[in-house]
Regions:
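Flexible, low-hydrophobicity surface segments
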Residues: 1-155, 182, 257, 464
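Short, surface-exposed loop/turn segments at secondary-structure boundaries that line and modulate
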Residues: 71-105, 139-151, 217, 221, ...
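Internal maturation/activation junctions in enzymes
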Residues: 574, 583, 587-628
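Glycine-rich loop/linker segments at domain edges
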Residues: 12, 18-21, 86, 155-199, ...
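Alpha-helical support elements that line or immediately flank enzyme active sites
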Residues: 43-73, 109-129, 199-268, 325-337, ...
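Structured beta-strand/loop patches that form or line metal/cofactor-binding pockets in enzymes
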Residues: 272-295, 466-469, 618-641
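Helix-loop-helix junctions that connect adjacent transmembrane helices in secondary transporters/permeases
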Residues: 143-230, 401-489
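Flexible hinge/switch segments at interdomain interfaces of large molecular machines
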Residues: 30-38, 192-197, 347-358, 482-486, ...
């Protein structure tokens, strides 16, 4: 294959094409979207984690010039909008009615002529709260005498879920020479994207049409839900996700602010915009982690792992409002067996409602993978110290070997490939591990506190195969639509949505790799449901494995038609034609060729008899399998015993994308 033809493709470093507009301040975010007669919305939030709402008095707010409407839960309830579905199959209060269930919950909204008036009016709304005891500990929430977080539920259990074989695991533990136990809490954290949530809605009730700008990682899924809530045909609802200033899982859920903005536009018959403030974002939008984990590792006398047992308490706050595949209530936590050949395992998970903001989003990972890797790596390291083994050696003894692939884990995953020992050995070599250990011992004799940590992890990404993965019944495929115009340039439309990942560069590069077209000649569209094929969006480490694969597949679909056009131009049979990126040529005479640009022109000006003109196709890609990235990290950290100050002495990371 000609080197020049490959240069636009995968493996070559290209400047990110989208960065220029951001550096110049020319990005288009929801806050940049406006329209004539646009009104502005602000949200009143509860200062209490749990309270009964005795009354809401908005009389004083209406005395402020410019206030258009005050929306409460009771007003929405009269329009059948008190509750909205979540992407995990639960329901969530749009605005609190009768009771607030977490600090920061949306209680009322003011819509005014300008944002300053809207925020000032919030201070004039009088809410009479009766404070109630709040449940913030999931263990307490499961006690028989605990008050209900949700009146629509019979208890505070969100779900019960398990994976693996409990009986076989019990037998493995009964035969173990040693059992290592760990209880740990992975605390709640907030993704805190640079841009908070935002929504612009322009609803025309007479035309039955809605145009909505949204900070969404999954525009098509949000369109499906919002169309149902509004009672509009889905094709009449347009969701546009323009430039998004980061998300990290935080912009996958559907939020009450979005729904109320749309409802306000419907009520007022004019455009309404809501820009969330940082306080509201940190108080109420999707948190991550919040797992209480109990892990047990059974080992024989030589340090071979015999079994793994895990119990989880997952705190989801007042509403199960994140986005988990419906079959996997605890996400993909059952990747917890990691890189190790563990014969049997059993994981049981309990999701719990508490008086906290909704939690459980996949922050910087794929569906709970970070928590899983944290637990198994802590367990293996603890076991090594208990057995007086080097942590690297215990890992080597228990890795899945290359010849064992494809490998089925004890919790049901089918790993396709990996060489975990090679990754660890490379990380140890690059870190100078043996020398680090010597320096550690010498330092201890001089009173230095130096720790050396190792992590050898396996992730799971690319959700997912439709037979197993969906959100609210929507299968987790993704899509790409590609058209080659007569000049040989390309227009690519995607079902995934960028929030800063660089899709406009990455996906253009995939087209360049497949077709030999310069990435500069590929226009990439995404984030507009009227101008892109239906897809599940970008979250959970899936955009390139699914959307990227859809892009590669649609390129190859086009090549099938392009080959017939090339054969017609060269006046030979299809079988006489060969392809390399950028050109078709005769197998018997490689200098006789037609370029992809010449083929594109012919598709519109001189197609073969009986062939439909044009050169375009769409691919809905259903992944046959997940992907299993893996790696090994080595870090050395020193702590000052007098001040507690710490510093990283060395950090080496070895990653394989799977």
């Amino acid at each position: 294959m000609a080197e020049a033809a490959r240069k636009p493709g995968i493996g070559y470093s290209l400047p990110r094409r989208e960065d220029d507009r951001f550096i110049r301040g020319q990005g288009t975010f929801v806050a940049d979207v406006s329209a004539p007669h646009m009104a502005h919305m602000a949200v009143l939030r509860s200062p209490l984690a749990r309270a009964r709402i005795r009354s809401i008095n908005a009389t004083r707010a209406f005395t402020l010039p410019g206030v258009l409407v005050v929306i409460t839960g009771e007003l929405l309830a009269r329009r059948n909008l008190a509750w909205m579905p979540t992407l995990s199959g639960d329901v969530q209060a749009v605005l609190a009615v009768d009771e607030v269930r977490f600090q920061g919950q949306e209680v009322a909204c003011v819509v005014a002529e300008d944002p300053y008036t809207a925020h000032d009016a919030l201070q004039l709304i009088e809410v009479d709260y009766e404070p109630l005891p709040a449940l913030v500990d999931p263990t307490e929430a499961l006690s028989p005498d605990a008050p209900l977080v949700r009146a629509d539920k019979s208890d505070n259990r969100c779900y019960e879920w398990e994976a693996g074989e409990p009986d076989a695991t019990d037998r493995a533990f009964a035969a173990a020479a040693r059992v290592t136990t760990l209880d740990t809490y992975y605390p709640r954290c907030h993704p805190a994207p640079l841009e908070c949530c935002a929504c612009f809605a322009d609803v025309d009730p007479d035309e039955g049409r809605a145009r909505i700008y949204l900070t969404s990682q999954a525009p098509h899924a949000h369109r499906t839900i919002l169309a149902q809530l509004m009672g509009l045909p889905e094709q009449q609802v347009q969701i546009i996700s323009p430039d998004i200033g980061g998300a990290f899982g935080n912009k996958v859920p559907l939020y009450p602010g979005y729904v109320v903005t749309v409802a306000a536009s419907f009520l007022l018959r004019r455009p309404v915009r809501w820009i969330e403030d940082r306080t509201g974002n940190l108080l109420s939008t999707g948190f991550a982690r919040d797992f209480r984990m109990h892990g047990e590792l059974a080992l024989d006398a030589e340090g071979r792992i015999l079994g793994l047992r895990v119990r989880l308490l997952s705190d989801h706050g007042a509403f199960y409002a994140d986005a988990q595949p419906s079959k996997f209530r605890a996400g993909l936590f059952h990747i917890v067996t990691g890189s190790y050949d563990i014969p049997t395992a059993h994981i049981s998970a309990t999701g719990v409602y508490t008086n906290k903001a909704p939690g459980g989003v996949a922050y910087r990972c794929s569906f709970r993978v970070t928590e899983a890797a944290y637990l198994i790596e802590r367990l293996v390291t603890n076991a090594a110290y208990e057995l007086d083994l080097d942590p690297a050696e215990l890992r080597r003894r228990n890795f899945i070997l290359p010849e064992q692939f494809p490998y089925r884990s004890a919790t049901g995953f089918s790993y396709d490939s990996g060489d975990y020992r090679a990754a660890l050995d490379l990380a140890l070599e690059k870190a100078g591990y043996e020398e680090l250990r010597k320096e550690q011992e010498e330092g201890r004799r001089r009173g230095r506190l130096v720790g050396i940590g190792i992590s050898s992890f396996t992730e799971v990404a690319g959700a997912g195969p439709s037979k197993d993965y969906d959100l609210l019944g929507i299968k987790m495929f993704d899509s790409a639509e590609l058209a080659i115009v007569p000049t040989g340039k390309a227009i690519l439309k995607l079902g995934v949505q960028s929030q800063g990942q660089g899709h406009e560069t990455t996906f253009a590069q995939i087209v360049g790799h497949e077709l030999g077209i310069s990435p500069a000649d590929v226009i990439v569209h995404h984030g507009d449901t009227d101008n892109s094929p239906y897809g599940l969006g970008t979250f959970g480490s899936r955009s390139t494995p699914t959307g990227g694969a859809a892009t590669a597949v649609v390129c190859r679909q086009l090549l099938n038609k392009a080959k017939k056009i090339a054969a017609n131009l060269l006046e030979v049979d299809d079988d006489d034609i060969a392809w390399e990126p950028g050109r078709f040529y005769l197998k018997s005479a490689e200098d006789q060729e037609v370029t992809i640009q010449e083929v594109a022109a012919a598709a519109y000006t001189n197609p073969p008899d009986g062939m439909e003109p044009g050169l375009d196709a769409v691919s809905y890609y259903n992944p046959p399998q997940l992907t299993f990235p893996y790696g090994s990290y080595v870090v050395a950290v020193e702590i000052n015993p007098e001040t507690g100050e710490w510093k990283v002495l060395k950090f080496v990371a070895v990653d394989d994308c799977g």
